[in-house]
Amino acid sequence: MRVTQGMIQQNSLRYIGSSYSKLDKLQSQISSGKKISKASDDPVVAMKSLKYNTQLSQVQQYKSNASQAFTWLENTETNITEGIDILSKVRELAVEAQNDTNGEPERQAIGVEVKQLKEQLLNIANTQVNGRYIFNGTNSDKPPVTDNGDGTYTISDTADVVVNISNNMSLKVNSDPKSAFGGTSESGQNVFEMLDSFEKALNSGSLDGMDSVLNDIDHFSDGMSAERSDLGARYNRLELVNTRLSAQEETATKVLSDNEDVELEEVITEFIAQQSVHRATLAVNAQIVQPTLIDFLK
C-alpha cells in the first residue's frame, strides 16, 4: 500500500491528539485528586464509587441519629436526676415537719418551700429542648403535665420516640412522663398531686398522714431512680453501637478513597513523563509533516 503524505499527517495528528488526551486526563486527576471525572472514564470505578458512597452515607446517617439520641437521653437523665434531688429535699422537709418543736408558722413556711419544689418539678416535667417537650414522646409540641387548678394534674399518655441507630436496630430515646416521674401512689395520686396534698396538709396543720407521705415520696423516688437506670442502660447500648458505627465509617471512607482517589505522587510523575513524550512527539511530527516537494527531490 502506498503511504501518502496525507496519511502521514493524519497519523501524526492522531498521535498528537492522543498525547493531549493523556495529558488532560492526568492534569484532571492532579487537580481533582480523583481517578475519574465522569462515569464513562471507568464504569467499574464509577459503579463501585456509587456503592461505597451509598454505604458511607447510610453509616453517616446512623451516626447523626445516634448523636440526636445521645442528646435526648442526656437531657432526659439530667432532668430526672434533678427531679430525684427535689424529692430528696421534700423528704427532708417532711421529716422536719414532724418535729414537735415546729409550730404552725414553721410548718406553713415548710409548705411554701414544698410548693416551690412542686413548681420546680413541674417545670422539669415540662422541659423543652430545641422547642420540643422531651417528656411528651412523639407529641413533643405540647407539655406533658397540666395543672388543672384543683389539686389534680393530668399526665399525658405518649408514644415512644424510636430512633434507627443501625441496620435492623432501633432505640427508644425518651422517657414517658408517667415512668419518668414515678407512676402513681397506692392512693392513685401522681407525684404532683401528692406534693399538692402535702402542701395543703402543712398549711392546715393536719399531719396525721405523714407516714403515708413519706412512703409516697419513697415510692416516687424509687420509680424515678428505676427509670434513670433504664436510661443509663440504653445510653451504654448506644455508646457501643456508636463505637461500631465510627469504625464502619472509617472503613467505608478508606474503601471509597482507595477506589476513587489517585496516588498524587505517582500521577505527577506520570504527568511529567507524559510531558516529555508529548514534546518528543511534537518534535518528531514537526519533522515529518514539514517536508515540501523540493525536500523530496533532493
From Swiss-Prot:
UniProt entry keywords in alphabetical sequence: Bacterial flagellum, Secreted
Localization of this protein: Secreted; Bacterial flagellum
One Gene Ontology term, aspect cellular component: bacterial-type flagellum hook
GO molecular function, one term: structural molecule activity
Listed Gene3D superfamilies: f41 fragment of flagellin, N-terminal domain
Superkingdom of origin: Bacteria
Pfam families in the record: Flagellin_C, Flagellin_N
GO biological process annotation, one example: bacterial-type flagellum-dependent cell motility
Family matches, as InterPro entries: Flagell_FlgL, Flagellin, Flagellin_C, Flagellin_N
Keyword Secreted set for record: yes
Family: Belongs to the bacterial flagellin family.
Protein's UniProt name: Flagellar hook-associated protein 3
Species annotation: Bacillus subtilis (strain 168)
Gene: flgL
